[in-house]
């Protein structure tokens, strides 16, 4: 198990309910989760249908992403119960997990 951070990773999903995300293939111009992650690797992700959204920590497993921890969402920070409509799902770096050091060596954390 490794913690994966990578650029330009984005797929679609038609997952409904609150279960694992079934990954539907890379969006045009992006790479698939499988290009950067192996089974049991952990990632920060965001999912959206342009109305609802969810940000969390997920575990990759054979072209699916298991919701491990929901960090924030449009559903009062709980798992979103999705309809079967197509959604975007991508790697992200959540603000609440960010630690930033500026040019004066001052450190701040996101919220």
Model-found features: residue ranges?
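Ser/Thr/Gly-rich low-complexity blocks that favor extended beta-strand/coil architectures
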Residues: 34-57
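Generic alpha-helical secondary structure signal
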Residues: 25, 34-37, 49, 64, ...
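Short, solvent-exposed secondary-structure boundary/capping segments
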Residues: 62-71
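Glycine-rich, low-complexity segments
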Residues: 1-30, 71-111
